């Protein structure tokens, strides 16, 4: 089993299948189908991310360089967590965007959902 250690943003443990993206993760585009149409399989809707497009992200360890896109990232992650549609964890190779991190932090405080964020 591969173990990662890094700067913890939201603590937790994660044992899950990894999904690896070589490009940035557009939070809104990736979760649009789950949020708008109730896709319970949580398939990535970002057509500009060939590594993740149409892959189920539910309960997976997302290995990403960084988040990209608009300022909605935090709210999208909070909403995904509050609906229990989140990945098991998100591992970032670059510094984590504070707006995106805020969504996971708020979900950790305000809900019973957990989304660990680690900068490796």
Describe each PLM feature range:
Residues 2-15, 19-117:
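Feature captures the catalytic cores and cofactor-binding loops of soluble hydro-lyases/lyases
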